Amino acid sequence: MTKKSYLRKEYIELRNGITFDEVDNAEINLLSIVRNNSELYANKKVSCYWSIGKELPTHELVLMLSGIGSEVYLPKMIDNSKKLKFVKTDGQLSLRENNLGISEPIGNTEIDPNELDIIFLPCVCFDKKGYRIGMGKGYYDYSLAGIDSSSIELIILAHEFQKIENCLPEDHDIKAHM
């Protein structure tokens, strides 16, 4: 097992071990930060993931962003590839579970990732340099390779305990702004 695989396994177990109260408190803190800084997100093109399990919850965040005038896009896996497309959500949040149990938007209105203003990224763990370890398939790294990251705010959403010293980045890993 590689060091990265070990970190992934360890931090998934840690995340699965937190209480639902801790998850709820983390969500309250996230929503408070966004609410208190809503001018940074209003009227922007924002991609957010639809959280699962004990990831930092994003369901209310997606609704909040829509409510302040952001165009919200959710990732959708492209069949037989390691890439994502970013699909606009409608006001009803019409979603369908894919074969991995991840909720994805049903719509077809896509956006080129370079046209997004903000991309919220999930992670298993992250480091102070802005690198993250995901679930191990590289969907975000492959999908965002080649974007102009100087004009797109890449923000990792995570619980505080998920911060580590070094994620052992590889050449293909994208760097977030935190």
Please place each PLM-identified region on the residue numbering:
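Redox-cofactor binding/interface segments in oxidoreductases and associated redox assembly factors
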Residues: 48, 121-122
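N-terminal active-site beta-alpha-beta segment that forms phosphate/nucleotide-binding
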Residues: 1-115
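Aromatic side chains
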Residues: 49, 73, 86, 126, ...
